[in-house]
Amino acid sequence: MAEKRNIFLVGPMGAGKSTIGRYLAQQLHMEFLDSDTVIEERTGADISWVFDVEGEEGFRKREEAVINDLTLEQGIVLATGGGSVKSRENRNRLSARGIVVYLETTIEKQLARTNRDKKRPLLQTDNPREVLESLAGERNPLYEEIADYTVRTDDQSAKVVANQIVKMLEES
């Protein structure tokens, strides 16, 4: 991989996008960015607050603006929010402006990785499994639609997955 193309990580919450993204950026000597973190920095509030005050629609508008800005950067690894693919504009920008890696995982792994995380507004419910299954049905086809590569993250450490991605990129 001679030139440093942007790498965009997509996938459901709990797939490991942020953790894997940090390792990947380190290995490739690239900058790591997380769209949710940038939204929080720009609003001065956490994602839960944005959801509470502006609703999901307000959050998605902010997310769209952030993804537009960040995908114009050069040489970055970007961890996107799980729902970012709901926007056609986001899907188009991610596809056109870099390499999209879909981090795939099971509902069981998502539940295990997110069960104590209070910063996930969509999971603040009595039945998170039902929510995750519904989100998977809606979003998994969208991740697949834009993915240049797909990597399962279930039973591997973040470092191992990052190494796999580096290898895939070197071979292409």
Curated annotation (Swiss-Prot):
This is Shikimate kinase. One of its GO terms (molecular function) is ATP binding. Catalyzes the specific phosphorylation of the 3-hydroxyl group of shikimic acid using ATP as a cosubstrate. It is found in: Cytoplasm. Pathway: Metabolic intermediate biosynthesis; chorismate biosynthesis; chorismate from D-erythrose 4-phosphate and phosphoenolpyruvate: step 5/7. ATP binds at residues 14-19, 120, 156. Its EC number is 2.7.1.71. One of its GO terms (biological process) is chorismate biosynthetic process. Gene3D superfamilies: P-loop containing nucleotide triphosphate hydrolases. PROSITE patterns: SHIKIMATE_KINASE. CDD domains: SK. The keyword Cytoplasm applies. The keyword Signal does not apply. Its cofactor is Mg(2+).
